[in-house]
Amino acid sequence: MNYIVMRGGRGASSSYGGDRNTGGTGKPMKFYDKTKSFQGMTKHEFENAIRDKTVEYIGVFNDKGELLVAGTSYSPNAVGVPTNHPRWNEVHDLTHNHPYKPANEPNRTIGATFSTADVENHLALDIKGETRAVSNGPNENTYIFRAKAGAKQNKNAFLKHSQKSEGVWNRDSTKKVKEVEKRLAKQGKTLSPAQRNQIVYGTAKHSWKSKAVTRAGYEYIEVKKSHW
């Protein structure tokens, strides 16, 4: 049975949301089914429809490219994963947006790449195809990771790489911000919140580019200029 909880202005939340979300909090989130709004779209059409959203949306597709379910939790930080949908067992690809100008972070200009939560979900939910994240910040469009064809996948190594990437991101972004602030101070200038934010999230993209991904049997793809 699909229990419904009414929410003024948002329509009804469905029972599709399971015990996982894209934010990695380990807590279920209300899932608002928006499949009808995107019905009939290809994966790339759906991604172009959500990349400018200020809250996270998610869509899952089967191996024939059919949209199974799409929706949102109306949060700029995460969206519930609809693992309770009756056709979840057909899921092949999972895509979602990383808001680059969310209401809770007015100075954020980059959606940024994957978090450890994205990798954990991909592995725990046994996504057979791709996990994708889309945004529309400067020089970014689509981030993709997937198992490398013909390679043996080492899930533990892949997860460790993502965790290490977050550590490198935090360390290097702090260092980079300080370097830029010091250089600007000599010129009598300051770093704006938007510029600081761009440095922080830009560093995240670089931390993912490592041979460790390939050694673990996966591919990481960053599409900068064309919307796939």
Where are these regions (language model features)?
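Structured interaction and signal-relay segments at domain junctions
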Residues: 69-79
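A domain-level signal for caspase-like cysteine endopeptidase catalytic cores
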Residues: 19-21, 53-57
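Short turn/helix-capping motifs enriched in Asx and small/polar residues
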Residues: 1-22
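Detector for glycine-centered tight turns/loop "hinges" at secondary-structure junctions
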Residues: 65-66, 140
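Beta-lactamase-like hydrolase cores
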Residues: 29-52
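Short secondary-structure boundary/capping segments within folded domains
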Residues: 47-52, 59-60, 84-85
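Active-site-proximal loop/helix of nucleotide/amide-processing enzymes and allied scaffolds
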Residues: 16-27, 78-228
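Short beta-strand scaffold segments in enzyme catalytic cores
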Residues: 56-63, 130-136
